[in-house]
């Protein structure tokens, strides 16, 4: 369906890509990234410039995977020594252990790195409120908590958002523009996580960032376990939409044993 169309007709091309099939967002993202790359080559300019961006310097966090508490503390301290100033701590299995591991990591890196929690839908709404209030009462200051409850549970997200000081971020709850509109309408989260592999590429990611900016909702740009090409596309988006995308979680390539592609 794309053969024979001009690369300059970008909006029409992305419309065709998004309408080509249901779901399959990663496949759509791969094709869109290639199209946007050709668009940049057509005008001999980096993508972030064509999208209106300025300073091309951003800083990512690094993920600390779930493990024994001592191992997570050691991994966190090693990440800080490598220069990372934001750590994304995986939680969401055992609520009591989660609280203790976060306290231990916070004590080890306080003043040197910010902590973000990612529960990966692992808590109930009441568990999340209990854990976050317990940490807040203990003096643990968190930058955010990511997707504490199941993706479909917007009422649970709203319940948490209304009861804790820690900003709540939606990840799996938001795949496209319609979900972010509903999330904002319900006031069910403070931050939205954009991932190109969820949105089906750059076109919907741009729409999400623009919608969020209109309503004063911050965004994070995130990734799956991805190689350098898709993460590079996300970097261009982050630079172009830096007024909306204020947090960066693009550590995917650093978590891969090797880069499967060149380019």
Indicate where each model-derived feature is located:
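Metal- or metallocofactor-binding catalytic centers and their adjacent structured scaffolds
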Residues: 1-42
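Conserved active-site and cofactor/substrate-binding residues in soluble primary-metabolism enzymes
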Residues: 8, 12, 22, 26, ...
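Flexible, glycine/charged-enriched surface loops at secondary-structure junctions
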Residues: 8-12, 46-50, 142-148, 223-224
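Shared catalytic-loop signature of beta/alpha-barrel
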Residues: 19, 152-169, 174-263
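Hydrophobic alpha-helical scaffolding
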Residues: 21, 25, 95, 147, ...
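Conserved, mostly hydrophobic/aromatic
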Residues: 31, 44, 87, 105, ...
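Generic detector of well-ordered alpha-helical packing
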Residues: 33, 38, 89-91, 119-120, ...
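Metal-dependent enolase-superfamily TIM-barrel catalytic cores that perform enediolate-based chemistry
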Residues: 50-164
């Amino acid at each position: 369906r794309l053969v024979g169309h001009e690369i300059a007709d970008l909006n029409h091309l992305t419309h065709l890509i998004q309408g080509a099939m249901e779901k399959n967002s990663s496949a759509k993202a791969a094709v869109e990234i290639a199209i946007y790359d050709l668009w940049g080559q057509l005008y001999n300019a980096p993508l972030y410039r064509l999208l209106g961006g300025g300073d091309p310097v951003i800083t990512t966090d690094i993920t600390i995977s779930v493990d024994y508490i001592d191992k997570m503390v050691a991994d966190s301290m090693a990440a800080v020594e490598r220069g990372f100033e934001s750590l994304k701590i995986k939680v969401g299995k055992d609520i009591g252990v989660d609280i203790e591991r976060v306290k231990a990591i916070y004590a080890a890196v306080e003043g040197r790195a910010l902590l973000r929690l990612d529960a990966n839908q692992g808590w109930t709404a009441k568990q999340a409120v209990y854990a976050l209030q317990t940490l807040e009462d203990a003096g643990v200051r968190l930058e955010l908590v990511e997707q504490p409850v199941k993706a479909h549970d917007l009422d649970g997200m709203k319940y948490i958002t209304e009861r804790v000081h820690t900003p709540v971020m939606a990840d799996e709850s938001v795949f496209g523009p319609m979900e972010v509109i509903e999330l904002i309408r319900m006031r069910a989260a403070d931050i939205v996580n954009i991932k190109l592999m969820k949105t089906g590429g750059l076109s919907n990611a741009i729409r999400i960032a623009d919608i969020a900016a209109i309503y004063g909702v911050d965004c994070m740009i995130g990734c799956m376990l991805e190689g350098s090409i898709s993460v590079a596309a996300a970097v261009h988006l982050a630079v172009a939409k830096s007024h909306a995308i204020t947090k960066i979680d693009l550590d995917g390539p650093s978590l891969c044993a090797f880069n499967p592609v060149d380019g």
